[in-house]
């Protein structure tokens, strides 16, 4: 199994809206995403983890998602809430 971890800096004062946006999209797509915000740790950072059985499954999920009109609408809102940068990691679970 693999974990796709996406870490992003959220604009100050926008975390609640960002969490709501991401959780709604996870629910809409019935994906296995988990949203993390720090109780202690870096300020204004959101981490989202998705699990995949393979790199092929990862590519299929994201290629199909980005091809939808809902993804375009989501990303339009996303860019109003997030700072430039972030990370997109793919981890093997031992």
Predicted regions and their residues:
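Short S/T/G/P-rich N-terminal loop/turn motif that feeds into the first structured element of a domain
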Residues: 1-94
């Amino acid at each position: 199994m693999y974990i796709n971890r996406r870490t992003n800096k959220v604009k100050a004062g926008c975390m609640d809206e960002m969490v709501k946006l991401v959780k709604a999209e996870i629910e809409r797509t019935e994906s296995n995403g988990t949203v993390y915000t720090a109780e202690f740790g870096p300020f204004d950072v959101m981490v989202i983890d998705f699990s995949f059985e393979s790199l092929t499954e990862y590519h299929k999920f994201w290629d199909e998602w980005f091809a939808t009109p809902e993804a375009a609408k989501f990303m339009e809102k996303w860019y109003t809430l997030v700072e430039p940068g972030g990370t997109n990691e793919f981890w093997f679970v031992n």
